[in-house]
């Protein structure tokens, strides 16, 4: 908040007068409230930053006892600071997301929660930039991600072949474990999913030629460490000191530097294929030098890997706890031998299961925005909210998607907290299409995720093929959420796994290398 506005707002803040006006009246959240049932303070600090979902929950402590707009819209205001507005109301989320862009008076993406990402990748990125710079980055970076590019049969076939090759290798490893331990085998799938996703990103999308062993043993662990450092750096590094300037006085800093070096090497390998026009570089029409693209490539590698791993991990986790849904997906995909765009689109129950995954457990649990001017926000039903310039906005899609008011029995026919792909059939039957019920899984409005179609392609391939090959059941009855940059199942997708058709597995594994040590 600039100096004059800071002083101007101070009397109202001290008197507890709301900064917001209009039909939508958010309820104030007290920083410290006697008798509060909240389990943490409503902002990240060194003792709660690993629990961001709980931080968002703290804004809505006791909110379900309210009626009116304050039930789903809250704000925190501390004298001397800009207000923080948090909403789990889909109407407000949609309105603000729609009005996020580069035009005067529109919302920016709030850079405050992304400081660690910017220090790790660069500020000149589609993720971090705002205004005209964001518009330039969008024009430069997004063409290869379009549906018309990714869903061409030739490109789709390349992704399918990579996955098929990887599955053959993993089947060989599984056969070894089955021989040693019998069936079923207990497996933590998240590391395997992450390696498969990174292989498709690096080798198919960018046309690199990196061995699966290198991806799994070097680059995936390095990116995990980079992501972990980004989260910690965002909360703790208030001075914005780059990692390269920190002395390696601890093992943690030294390991973080090694991980960033591996990340740089992976970025080099993906950029090296540009001159040859391999992968989707052939769709990239720009004279920009490699150094101008480097930051966006790093954001893409880390961000797309996080998002697609989260998406696929949650889908498999949900299906592992819902045998009926898993069987329905299997009967739909069991006869698919060639993964074409048409075949994936025809797998309607699989696609409903994926939509339900994004609703119940979105990869990105909130979207940060900031008001660039005093502004009115108007919902599709005509209600209005005025907020002052500088307001920090958190669009809390995690709790919006899981609330009974928005997705419960009265609206969709099923409880909001249950994983029910049939929910989407019910929605369609009652003429409530995607314009009325949005899961915001890829964001919304001008700043929606440019990797949406890539995510749909990769996760559709992985989940469809996985269900076709394996029968799996969760080890733990319930699964909590683990959240950092994205959300993931806290148990790492721990399942008991067995092959559906041993004869098929044996014939497939017979042609695969057997030097891998197991899942």
Regions flagged by a language model, labelled:
Residues 47-70, 339-381:
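Conserved cytochrome P450 K-helix E-x-x-R motif and the immediately C-terminal K′/meander segment
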Residues 248-252, 350, 355-369, 491-519:
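C-terminal domain-closing interface element
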Residues 1-123, 128, 132-136, 162-169, ...:
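N-terminal membrane-proximal hinge/A-helix region immediately C-terminal to the signal-anchor transmembrane segment
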Residues 109-113, 153-312, 333:
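Cytochrome P450 heme-thiolate monooxygenase catalytic core
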């Amino acid at each position: 908040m600039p100096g004059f506005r800071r002083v101007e707002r101070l009397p109202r803040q001290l008197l507890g007068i709301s900064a917001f006006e209009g039909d939508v009246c958010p309820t104030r959240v007290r920083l410290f409230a006697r008798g509060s049932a909240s389990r943490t303070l409503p902002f990240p600090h060194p003792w709660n930053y690993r629990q961001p979902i709980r931080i968002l929950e703290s804004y809505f402590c006791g909110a379900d006892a309210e009626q009116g707009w304050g039930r789903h819209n809250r704000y925190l205001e501390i004298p001397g600071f800009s207000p923080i507005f948090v909403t789990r109301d889909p109407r407000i989320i949609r309105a603000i997301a729609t009005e996020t862009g580069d035009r005067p008076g529109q919302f920016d993406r709030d850079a405050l929660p992304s400081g660690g990402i910017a220090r790790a990748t660069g500020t000149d990125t589609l993720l971090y930039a705002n205004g005209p710079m964001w518009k330039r980055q969008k024009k430069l970076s997004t063409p290869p991600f379009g549906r018309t590019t990714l869903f061409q049969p030739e490109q789709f076939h390349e992704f399918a072949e990579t996955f098929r090759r990887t599955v053959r290798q993993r089947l060989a490893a599984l056969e070894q474990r089955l021989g040693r331990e019998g069936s079923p085998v207990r497996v933590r799938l998240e590391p395997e999913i992450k390696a498969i996703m990174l292989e498709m990103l690096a080798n198919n999308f960018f046309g690199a030629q990196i061995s699966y062993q290198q991806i799994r043993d070097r680059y995936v662990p390095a990116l995990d460490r980079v992501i972990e450092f980004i989260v910690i750096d965002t909360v703790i590094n208030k001075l914005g000191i780059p990692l390269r300037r920190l002395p390696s006085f601890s093992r943690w800093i030294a390991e973080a530097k090694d991980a960033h070096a591996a990340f740089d090497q992976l970025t080099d390998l993906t950029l090296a294929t540009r001159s040859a026009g391999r992968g989707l570089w052939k769709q990239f029409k720009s004279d920009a030098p490699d150094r101008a693209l480097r930051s966006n490539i790093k954001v893409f590698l880390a961000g797309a890997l996080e998002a697609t791993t989260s998406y696929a991990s949650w889908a498999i986790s949900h299906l592992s706890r819902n045998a009926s849904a898993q069987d329905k997906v299997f009967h739909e995909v069991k006869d698919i031998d060639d993964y074409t765009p048409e075949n994936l689109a025809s797998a309607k129950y699989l696609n409903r299961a994926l939509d339900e995954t994004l609703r119940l457990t979105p990869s990105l649990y909130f979207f940060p925005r900031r008001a660039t001017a005093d502004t009115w926000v108007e919902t599709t039903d005509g209600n209005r909210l005025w907020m002052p310039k500088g307001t920090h906005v958190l669009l809390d899609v995690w709790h919006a998607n899981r609330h009974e008011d928005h997705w419960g029995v009265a609206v969709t026919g099923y409880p909001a907290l249950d994983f029910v792909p049939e929910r989407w059939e019910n929605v369609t039957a009652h003429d409530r299409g995607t314009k009325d019920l949005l899961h915001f899984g890829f964001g919304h409005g001008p700043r929606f995720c440019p990797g949406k179609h890539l995510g749909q392609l990769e996760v559709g391939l992985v989940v469809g093929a996985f269900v076709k090959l394996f029968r799996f059941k969760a080890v733990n009855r319930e699964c909590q959420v683990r959240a950092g940059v994205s959300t993931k199942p806290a148990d790492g997708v721990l399942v008991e796994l067995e092959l559906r058709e041993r004869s098929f597995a044996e014939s497939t594994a017979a042609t695969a290398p057997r030097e891998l040590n197991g899942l």
